[in-house]
Every structure is written in structure tokens, then in C-alpha cells.
Regions:
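Acyl-donor-binding surface of acyltransferase catalytic domains
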Residues: 60-63, 73-145, 287-292
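Conserved active-site tyrosine of GNAT-family acetyltransferases
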Residues: 111-115, 271, 275-276, 280
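Conserved donor-binding loop and adjoining core beta-sheet/short helix segment
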Residues: 10-94, 104, 203, 208-223
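Conserved hydrophobic beta-strand within the GNAT/NAT acetyltransferase core sheet
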Residues: 100-103, 225, 259-263
Length: 292
């Protein structure tokens, strides 16, 4: 089924935006497995004799009482509306009290119109940014802090990572804290399944920020920065840039030809300015909708 899912998803993505990054096997498995709790997935078609036309992945997050919904449809297929109806029915059956967040490419006007007709409103905008590697990378000043790789097989490092991560994102839109046990299970899973690496920056021996990246986009010969954050008390001191430049350096040394990440367009921490400063450029825009 992963092959079918990727075929549907990439035909959808690239028809809407040929510059977008095609989905790879790791992402396909994530959509089937689930981001947090087990996913609810369906392939849909109008007639028995048809090929599969749409893929629905409904990802529950029980700790946040929230669903994340993605629907991919082959260009020209007429399965989008019935697939959305099916997803809404599955969500209600699972838990009618959950909020529903849906991701849509910014130029998928048919899907956006369908959502708005169902009473959904746009909640947030996100950009995917990418840069070419290798680049002439400015080295960060040692006075900014010391960067070391976290050993995700050690509980002490996991607890340090958890503390820094939760504090760094505590003021971000939609953030809700996760307890260590639940959070660490997700991190260990991502280490094993996506080859995630995490790096910590400390100032005078005090943990201050982190960056993590993985092989999710390896099929595109690209590294993927899945997380970058600086604790509230250390923001505005250049630590985020030092961490990002470290990620650029490591991915260049790994032989990747590109590096990409996603950013909340409404992020007030100056993240977008930082990414553009190091040479990243937007290649796609996504809109997140919410049911009211």
C-alpha cells in the first residue's frame, strides 16, 4: 500500500506545485503508522473497477485532543468530497470532542473551497524552505556556546533534551506540553525509524537550545531539520543561528545536496529571517484549517 499511497500523494503534490518536495518512503510509513497515536487510514475510489484515487490519513493525538488530517487525491479524480466526508465521519466515531486540523497546499483552491463550505477556517500558514549544499558556512563563535551531540540512548540526555525542547516551544502557537515518558517514546521511535540526530548547545555549562534533523527527505538527497529551538532565557543571543549553521555543516559533511525545513509563517521569534539569512528560500506554502 505504501507504493500506492506515494503514487497518489506525489501526483497530487507535484500537479499543484512542481517545485514541491515529493514524498518518500519514510513519510509514507509515518502517514500509515501515525504521528503520535495509531493513524486511521483509508484508500478511496468511486467505482469498484477504478484504481485507488485518494488517500486519507487521520492522525489522532490523544494528549492534545486533536486530529491532524491529510487527504491526497489524484489530479482529475472526483473523490475529494466523499473522502472528506469519510474522514469527518471517522473522526466523529473516534472522538467527537477532538479538534480537527487539516493541511492544504496554498494553491489547492478546490480543496480550500470545499473546506470553507464545510465551515472550516484558515488557522495558520506554513512555508517549506530549502537551500543547496554545500555552502560557505560561517563558523559560530565559541563564546556563543558549546554544541555537542545528544546520545538518545541515554536517559540523562533524553531528559535534558525534553527540558530544553518543552521550554523552547512553550510560547509557540498550539503548543501543549508532553510528559517525558510519552515524549521520549516518540523521540526514540524517530531515532530508530528516521535516523534522527539531536544536538545541544550549552552556555557556561547550562543547556540552552537544540537542533534535530533526520533522513525523512533522503530520497530527495536532502537533510531535513525537524526541530530547532532555544530556551526562553537564552533567546536573542544568536544561539539559533549557531545551531542551524551546525546542522548545515553536518548535512554537508554527510554529502547531502540540499537541506530543508518547515516554518510557521506567524512565528514571532524571527525564525523566517534566520532561515533566509543562511540562504534558505521558500519552495511551497501550506495552509492549516480548523473546524469551528
Amino acid at each position: 500500500d505504501i507504493v500506492k499511497i506515494l503514487d497518489i500523494a506525489n501526483s497530487n503534490l507535484l500537479a499543484l506545485n512542481p517545485s514541491d518536495i515529493p514524498m518518500g518512503e519514510i513519510e509514507g510509513h509515518e502517514f500509515v503508522r501515525g504521528f503520535f497515536d495509531p493513524a486511521i487510514t483509508r484508500l478511496t475510489k468511486l467505482h469498484e473497477e477504478d484504481d485507488w484515487q485518494s488517500f486519507v490519513t487521520l492522525n489522532p493525538d490523544s494528549s492534545r485532543k486533536r486530529f491532524y488530517l491529510d487527504i491526497y487525491t489524484r489530479p482529475g479524480a472526483r473523490t475529494l468530497a466523499p473522502s472528506l466526508d469519510l474522514a469527518l465521519e471517522l473522526a466523529r466515531k473516534h472522538d467527537p470532542g477532538y479538534r480537527l486540523w487539516l493541511g492544504v497546499q496554498s494553491n489547492d483552491f478546490a480543496y480550500k473551497s470545499l473546506l470553507e463550505n464545510h465551515g472550516f477556517t484558515i488557522l495558520r500558514k506554513y512555508w517549506t524552505l530549502e537551500m543547496k549544499l554545500p555552502v560557505e558556512n560561517e563558523s559560530s563563535s565559541p563564546s556563543l556556546g558549546v554544541i555537542r551531540e545528544l546520545d538518545l540512548d541515554k536517559e540523562d540526555d533524553l531528559r535534558t533534551f525534553h527540558e530544553v525542547h518543552q521550554d523552547a516551544f512553550s510560547q509557540h502557537f498550539g503548543f501543549m506540553p508532553r510528559q517525558f515518558n510519552e515524549w521520549s517514546e516518540i523521540v526514540i521511535r524517530d531515532k530508530d525509524e528516521t535516523n534522527m540526530q539531536a544536538w545541544l548547545i550549552s552556555v557556561n555549562g547550562v543547556p540552552a537550545g537544540f537542533v534535530d534533523f533526520n533522513d525523512e527527505q533522503l530520497h530527495n538527497d536532502s537533510g531535513y531539520v525537524s526541530g530547532l529551538g532555544v530556551m526562553q532565557a537564552f533567546q536573542g543571543k544568536g544561539l539559533g543561528e549557531a545551531l542551524l549553521r551546525h546542522a548545515i555543516q553536518i548535512n554537508s559533511e554527510l554529502g547531502r545536496s540540499k537541506l530543508c525545513l518547515s516554518v510557521d509563517a506567524g512565528n514571532e521569534s524571527g525564525a523566517l529571517r534566520l532561515y533566509e539569512k543562511v540562504g534558505m528560500k521558500p519552495i511551497s506554502e501550506w495552509h492549516q484549517y480548523e473546524d469551528l
